């Protein structure tokens, strides 16, 4: 979840997961293991997934019965790399009612992301190990500290360096996130760090 409505995160596949798992067991606070169903929507008047890179996402999330609606607006460099997102999220009482509202407003479902997420807290990071149906296992690291004066690109580099320092080896980051990878696998772009 974003801090101050800003989200700075990396989403990577790591060459070696064991060093991270061992580090988290010894040094981080385990928070939860959840089954998350993320359903993404696009309004008829503005097709979010037609633009490249995809800038906006509208998501309904069901986390073992706890439901949220989230809107993300990504900011990109001139090279098309995401720096951070404006994120607005609120809890819902009934995800099926929210789905009906969105569909009544002519928002069409575009993709479902089905994942098991294990989450830890370490210092200013939320670290998640994700198993997404149809994709490789991934690691997501989100910065949850003070946002005053933070350079998103520097913070993302710091997160990658953290994973390398504990022995994860090469990192492969994707530019579009899980929803994009499932929707457009042929357009997936990865960067090795």
What are these model-derived regions, one by one?
Residues 93-94, 135, 163:
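Short, intrinsically disordered/low-complexity patches at protein termini
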Residues 126-134, 143-146:
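An amphipathic alpha-helical core segment
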Residues 72-75, 134-142:
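Residues forming anionic-ligand binding surfaces in small-molecule and nucleic-acid pockets
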């Amino acid at each position: 979840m974003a801090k101050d409505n800003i989200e700075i995160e990396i989403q990577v596949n790591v060459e070696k997961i064991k060093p991270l798992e061992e580090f988290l067991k010894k040094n981080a606070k385990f928070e939860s293991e959840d089954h998350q169903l993320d359903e993404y929507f696009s309004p008829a008047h503005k097709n979010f997934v037609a633009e490249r890179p995809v800038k906006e996402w509208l998501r309904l999330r069901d986390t073992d019965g706890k439901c949220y609606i989230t809107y993300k607006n990504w900011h990109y460099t001139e090279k098309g790399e995401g720096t951070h997102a404006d994120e607005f999220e609120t809890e819902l009482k009934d995800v099926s009612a929210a789905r009906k509202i969105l569909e009544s407003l002519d928002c069409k479902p575009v993709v479902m992301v089905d994942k098991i997420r294990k989450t830890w807290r370490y210092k200013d990071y939320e670290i998640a190990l994700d198993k997404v149906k149809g994709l490789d296992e991934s690691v997501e690291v989100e910065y949850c500290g003070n946002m005053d004066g933070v350079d998103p690109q520097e913070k993302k580099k710091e997160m990658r360096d953290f994973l390398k320092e504990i022995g994860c080896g090469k990192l492969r980051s994707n530019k579009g996130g899980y929803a994009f990878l499932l929707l457009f696998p042929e357009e997936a772009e990865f960067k090795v760090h």
